[in-house]
């Protein structure tokens, strides 16, 4: 399986990552990617930038080192209402919004509370994809959430870092369940390295292996094609990006 988009990456702006966006873009080029989503942590994460950082991504060139740049964020799901930690004014500046649970921001609670938070963040319409759902600290009703994601065209991320066992330990078994059920329900999937250093860009081997294990069709894996990824953004109501006309 060929992956041409890395949908989850971090720069030094996140506070605990180690590469610049230029270093990430060069790594993406060298590894054969066509599109790179830059998705730094949103403000409530310790060490993360002010929301102006995300609004000001409009100054970024659409291509760096010949790789198309998608302006994004890894937002924090804040509460059971499904609120995220960016003002509404930021939405117009962002191509790709991940929503994730992080322990310093949303203290692990009950399965019912996690489920409510995920359903409400989906229904908010502000989020394109749910990040690293396999974290065992945040159990949720998988069927209810995945069916809600499908009906609202919100993608489910397969996070390679979660599968390595180095972060969010114990995620692998839950990721397996999520992919199996997601395939049955017919959700869209994305693949993210969750790179915090440029050498991790496009490191997606475990995510690919898991998707192939369950026979997920390529047309449900957004990151296998620039056209598929960008058409999904149109489906989500995002404006067409004219600089990427050749990728549609």
From Swiss-Prot:
SUPFAM superfamilies: PHP domain-like (SSF89550). InterPro entries: Phosphatase_YcdX_put, PHP_dom, PHP_phosphatase, Pol/His_phosphatase_N, Pol/histidinol_Pase-like. Its EC number is 3.1.3.-. The keyword NAD does not apply. Its cofactor is Zn(2+). It comes from the Bacteria. One of its GO terms (biological process) is bacterial-type flagellum-dependent swarming motility. This is Probable phosphatase VPA0505. HAMAP family: YcdX_phosphat (MF_01561). CDD domains: PHP_HisPPase_Ycdx_like (cd07437). The keyword Metal-binding applies. NCBIfam families: PRK09248.1. Zn(2+) 1 binds at residues 8, 10, 74, 194. Belongs to the PHP family. GO terms for molecular function: phosphatase activity; zinc ion binding. One of its GO terms (cellular component) is cytosol. It is an enzyme of class 3 (hydrolase). Keywords: Hydrolase, Metal-binding, Zinc. Zn(2+) 3 binds at residues 74, 102, 132. Binds 3 Zn(2+) ions per subunit. Zn(2+) 2 binds at residues 16, 41, 196. It comes from Vibrio parahaemolyticus serotype O3:K6 (strain RIMD 2210633).
